[in-house]
Curated annotation (Swiss-Prot):
Protein's name in the database: Holo-[acyl-carrier-protein] synthase
Organism lineage: Bacteria, Bacillati, Bacillota, Clostridia, Moorellales
The keyword GTP-binding is assigned to this record: no
InterPro entries: 4-PPantetheinyl_Trfase_dom, 4-PPantetheinyl_Trfase_dom_sf, ACPS, Ppantetheine-prot_Trfase_dom
EC number: 2.7.8.7
Length: 128
């Protein structure tokens, strides 16, 4: 079975939130995600794309907010630049329980918005 999740976020909204609540970076993103994004030309856009990806993964898994930590879903990059999802702790456990085989994600951003789509392939179906 294939499940999809999508999310879009206004980049400036996330930037304002981080400015008001600096601890948000450490609460939502892994140290590796923060380091990567802060080294980019537009750190806010990179952070927002990863935020959207985490939300899209949660939606595709059907777990919603609060079932795992934001940091349990990490967005990295393969050598060729393709984004990759790594699940940790509770998110990994939930994915196993759901029979998740593979998660793919696509990120995009423009001047004002960042968006992500996640596809989750699982071996379980509601039909049995």
């Amino acid at each position: 079975m294939l499940e999809a999740g999508i999310d879009i976020i206004e980049i400036s909204r996330l930037e304002r939130s981080i400015k008001r609540h600096p601890r948000l970076l450490a609460r939502v993103f892994t140290p590796a995600e923060v380091a990567y994004c802060l080294a980019r030309h537009r750190p806010g856009a990179s952070l927002a794309a990863r935020f959207a990806a985490k939300e899209a993964v949660m939606k595709a898994l059907g777990i919603g907010l609060g079932r795992c930590s934001w940091q349990d879903i990490e967005i990295t990059r393969e050598q060729g630049g393709r984004p990759r999802v790594i699940l940790h702790n509770r998110a990994r456990q939930l994915a196993r329980e759901l029979g998740v085989g593979e998660i793919t994600v696509s990120l995009s951003h423009c001047h004002a918005y960042a968006a992500a789509v996640a596809l989750v392939e699982s071996s379980f179906s509601e039909e049995g």
